[in-house]
């Protein structure tokens, strides 16, 4: 429900979040689920699933120095981790890059891969862990801009990354 309010309502009324918190404290998690709230959860789950399907459809593949990269676009409804997990389930690659609507970059690797993702994230001013890293682009990225942004990312990796 909190995700519904945060992601699907452009200006979430704090009173709805406050009421949810009070109801959860008083009635417990199950007791606070009114029919209206159950419907909101269904709507959120449906829209989230649609967005995850769109993430997979947006995948572009490229190869750098013998390694397969999959890059995909995700709107703010899903996290970089959720988007990456869905792409990993559906696309074979060594490295997965999720470009978020807010300009965030999420790097993940295949479980069998030994590629250290930190140097990749460093190219974009980010960091993290060898298996999961992140960075940020300057500004938001629209679906329309994704093609151009993915080409820029490819060029930066091709010219600056040493496996």
Residue positions per predicted region:
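Glycine-rich, Lys/Arg-enriched anion-binding loops that position phosphate/diphosphate groups
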Residues: 1-81
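Gly/His-enriched, cation/cofactor- and phosphate-binding structural elements
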Residues: 48-163
């Amino acid at each position: 429900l909190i995700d519904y309010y945060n992601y699907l309502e452009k200006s979430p009324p704090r009173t709805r979040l406050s009421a949810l918190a009070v109801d959860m404290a008083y009635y417990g998690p199950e007791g606070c689920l009114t029919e209206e709230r159950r419907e909101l959860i269904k709507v959120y789950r449906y829209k989230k699933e649609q967005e995850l399907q769109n993430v997979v459809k947006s995948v572009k593949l490229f190869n750098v120095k013998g390694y397969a990269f999959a890059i995909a676009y995700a709107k703010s409804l899903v996290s970089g981790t959720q988007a990456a997990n869905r792409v990993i389930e559906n696309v074979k690659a060594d490295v997965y890059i999720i470009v978020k609507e807010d300009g965030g970059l999420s790097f993940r690797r295949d479980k069998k891969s030994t590629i250290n993702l930190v140097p990749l994230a460093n190219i974009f001013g980010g960091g993290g862990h060898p298996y999961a890293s992140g960075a940020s682009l300057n500004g938001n990225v629209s679906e329309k801009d994704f093609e151009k942004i993915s080409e820029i990312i490819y060029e930066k990796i091709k010219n600056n990354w040493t496996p």
